[in-house]
Amino acid sequence: LPDQAHALPHITPVQDWHQAPAVAANNALPVLQACPSPATLPAFGQIQATAGRMAADSITHAARATLRGQCAALVTAPIHKEALALAGEPFPGHTEMLQALAAQHTGTPVADMPVRMMLANAELKTVLNSIHISLRQAIEAVTQEQLLQTITITHRFLAQQLQTQTSTPAANQPTRAPIIAVAGLHPPAGQVG
């Protein structure tokens, strides 16, 4: 893909994932239609089960391709949670759906594969302690166990990233450990909050 963030690459449809590297080498964005279009496309602006089904099928297809190593990463667009529910999907959003697909791929029970959502760029990485729950539930989710799990997941990921970035550290130089800041629930969190 082009290095310039402002340059939009040309979108090129591909029939198979194997065509993607050649298309990308020509500074184009390879796009594979993951699931067939229905005879009638869902109407814009209307919440429909058909749209939810197409979104779920597309995410499932792309996630499985990524888990198989056919893709380096998965980028998802916003999905409508109500349309997902109308399509019969039990997940409130992407994160839970991707967690279930990853657990299925590894043969791990979903409960044994906790995940968190990270918003990241080169300057800042932010990990959410909870998602897709009400404010009351989010406040209740701020427990020592939940926070430690979030910090542990984040630490493992960042340590792996730092190790990758410093592939061959100089002799006698320790690998840098991730430093993680934890924001309080409200500004005076340390004042009996």
Can you name each region flagged by the protein language model?
Residues 77-80, 126-134:
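Acidic/polar active-site rim loop that often engages polyanionic ligands
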Residues 73, 113-116, 124-125:
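Generic beta-strand structural signal
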Residues 90-92, 110, 118:
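Active-site loop-to-helix "anion-binding N-cap" substructures in soluble metabolic enzymes
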